[in-house]
Amino acid sequence: MKILIIDDDLLMVEAQTALLTQAGHEVLSSTHSGKAIELIRAHIPDCVITDIIMPEVDGIQILKQISDDKQLTGIKVIIVSAKPFKFDRRQAMKMGAAGFITKPIDPATYCAQIQCAITEKIKLTFWGVRGTLPVPGKRAFKYGGNTSCVTLELPKGEFFIFDAGSGIKELSNHIMATRDGKLNAKIFISHPHWDHINALPFFSPLYIPGNEFEILGTSHAGISMESLITAQMDDVYFPITMHQLESSVYFRDLTQGEYDVDGVNVKTFLLNHPGNSLGYRINYNGRSICYITDNEFFLPDSPNYDLDYINRLSEFIEDTDALITDCTYLDNEYPSKVGWGHSCVSQVAAVAHQANVKNLYLFHHDPDQDDAKIDLKLADAKMALEKLGSKTVVSAPTETQSFLI
């Protein structure tokens, strides 16, 4: 891919050039923004990477010139700037930028960010895959021991976090190391059981001025999402209250329905779990990701088996590119856990097949399961799908593992 870098900082140009060249791209560059359009017309790159603040012509002007020129249609423009303000990001995206990356860049993730913006891929990352309770020690060496936390990084900079189990501390470490803690994000809570909210107070970006978060989820037993989250940070339980956070934090109560979140279509579905628990479907540019945890599919011979519910949920997740779902138990473990609000392998595989799911990610593993048990669960899921003649691809993600959707 041919990429043109426009930045008046020579060191930044050299750093980005080295990374992109190593990744196999053809790279051109200039530190003179006044010559940008001349260079673009002469070379017709696939992508232009530009800073905003430059002494001759700023990056937003370059973006506008490209957008207004019909001969330059198809060139992707990515902003790489030290400006952290939402206004600049919104303005750039509104004018057609393919992505917005905030300096300083992280050499470990920079090329992947550029690739995601160019191809409009969604980056899905697992920060905690366990359920109920964190699992420290060698039993969890392969898959990790942290509880529920998953992120979606969308091509235009939207950052969605799903649940705040202990995995959110691993995410926190990553954000502090790669972004200097700077983050504006949406935090979707499935439900307020401990393994989905209790590590939120340890998410360091919440304490950084200038950051902005919206926490979204359903009320529970008539208690709003704001009250649920605030209560666990009451000074009886935790030394720092919600009112002491230095970031801006907002709350939104959701029910089953359809929402616009940062311009992204989000659908919600009430799940079969004690109390209110929401599943989420994110629809973006012809692709979708479903986050369905915690949820119980009763077996067909159970008096609680609800075919109508299964069909409605199957319709909700139908044809999704990625289904992240509760698969807490092996089939032989499930009979002693009926009614606990979690599912076993065979039923998860059957519903994924029924819904024509493209990729199935097993999630929310029981704390008593070691890595070998999760390996067995994955093998059982593959066998079940094979018997059904399914095209669904199944995997059991490990902690910090990422996928491009």
Question: What positions do the PLM features span?
Answer:
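Cap/insert and terminal regions of metallo-dependent hydrolase folds
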Residues: 298-391
